[in-house]
């Protein structure tokens, strides 16, 4: 296992460049993926719903901030919030969402935020962040002293997760675009489960981890994980 000092030296990371043929289909693929269009994406969304439900179990009456809210597909799971704000720079992802009317403020970066939040959410976003230590530091600034950070991440870097996308999404991607899905994964998922967890344990006093029970809730046998930090 890596230690914190080894991991922190890797940041900021540089995302691998995509060849032009991948760039041409990238936005289309991202929207299809986020909207769970197609059998493989639908199956992934069903498995991912476990994390949405786990995050929503933490009920309270207060203000929520979601980082990387995408298509706003988590909003329907939260029932008791006063206001729901988001950080999402990709406007195409949410502009046609039926949950848009439930959103109070839409931010593109942390500098626009003046509030503190009791509950901050980030779902399948931390694996994409090229400067994750900076992101975590900014999150701590806007997290209420009695608040908590709730994140969901894939078990990137582990056997089950890799086999999962290789035999579902990768096949569908190859069939549709005649391209190698592993190129997209290397471009998109720049952080592993292990790296994310070690960073979080350095920045927060209490870090609770719960793995998806499918296939088994242990290393190399689970696809996704829910992490609560306070």
Language model features by range: what are they?
Residues 4, 9, 16, 27, ...:
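Short linear sequence elements within intrinsically disordered, low-complexity coil regions
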Residues 4, 15, 19-22, 43-45, ...:
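Short linear sequence motifs
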Residues 6-21, 32-34, 38-42, 130-141, ...:
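S-adenosyl-L-methionine-dependent methyltransferase catalytic module, highlighting the catalytic core
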Residues 23-56:
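Class I SAM-dependent methyltransferase Rossmann-like catalytic core
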Residues 50-161, 225-230:
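Conserved SAM-binding loop
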């Amino acid at each position: 296992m890596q230690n914190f000092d080894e991991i922190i030296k890797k940041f900021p990371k540089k995302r691998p460049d995509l060849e032009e043929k991948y760039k041409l289909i990238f936005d289309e693929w991202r929207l299809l993926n986020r909207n769970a269009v197609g059998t493989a994406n639908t199956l992934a969304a069903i498995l991912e719903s476990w994390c949405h439900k786990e995050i929503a179990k933490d009920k309270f009456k207060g203000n929520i901030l979601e980082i990387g809210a995408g298509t706003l597909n988590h909003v329907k799971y939260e029932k008791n919030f006063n206001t729901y704000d988001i950080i999402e720079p990709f406007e195409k992802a949410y502009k046609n969402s039926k949950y848009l009317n439930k959103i109070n403020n839409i931010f593109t970066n942390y500098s626009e935020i003046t509030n503190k939040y009791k509950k901050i959410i980030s779902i399948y976003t931390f694996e994409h962040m090229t400067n994750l230590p900076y992101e975590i530091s900014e999150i701590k600034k806007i997290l209420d002293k009695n608040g908590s950070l709730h994140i969901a991440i894939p078990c990137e870097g582990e056997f089950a997760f890799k086999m999962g996308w290789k035999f579902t999404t990768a096949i569908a991607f190859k069939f549709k675009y005649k391209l190698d899905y592993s190129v997209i994964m290397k471009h998109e998922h720049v952080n592993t489960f292990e790296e994310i967890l070690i960073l979080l344990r350095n920045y927060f006093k209490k870090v609770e981890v719960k793995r998806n029970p499918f296939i088994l809730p242990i290393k190399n046998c689970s696809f996704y994980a829910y992490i609560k930090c306070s």
